Amino acid sequence: MLLIYKNMPLGAVISSHTSIVPVLDRMGIGLGVGEATVEEVCINKGVDVDFLLSILNTFLNEGYFPEKSFQRASKEDVLSYLKSTYEYYLTSQIPVIEAHMSHLELGESTPLHMLKRMVGNLKSAISSAMENDSKMDFDASDEYCQTAISLIDDVKSLIIKLISGSYNKNMCYALLFFLSSFHKDLSHHLRIRYRVLIPMMK
């Protein structure tokens, strides 16, 4: 298990684990970190370093459970992270899916209409998860997150099984790869909720 520690240069960590870039962004940390350590960047950005390490290590390691000493973040920090995660999905991920769909060159086919309806349902599920988390109704939010993951699987399945004939193959493949990445991110988000965020709220 490869863990991130506060004395590690954050730039080197990002270079080894580029998948954490969106997670860092949700915490208010962008690129351009220079040679600063994880702790130095957190101090500069006003981020709780232990909270960040809990999030990142849980994101990267399926078998990781945060140390009790890490579970000190405020309720405001947790709710802010949850909100920024959903906003990232709604303002970054979903629009990318919609943009890919618009370039599939499917015309006004039945599969395209089905895809649009599924993506609309995906957007609604994520919006509902965000709303319920803001009310601290975490069980309801978990259900909406699971629904979102199932919808991503449904979109992938529809593309694989129903799209045929003349279409933009490169864009279709890119969409499948992107959906797989989105599925992985959402699954990691659920793991972080169970192991880090919700325990901090109790």
Feature map (PLM): residue ranges:
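Small-residue-biased structural context
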Residues: 1-202
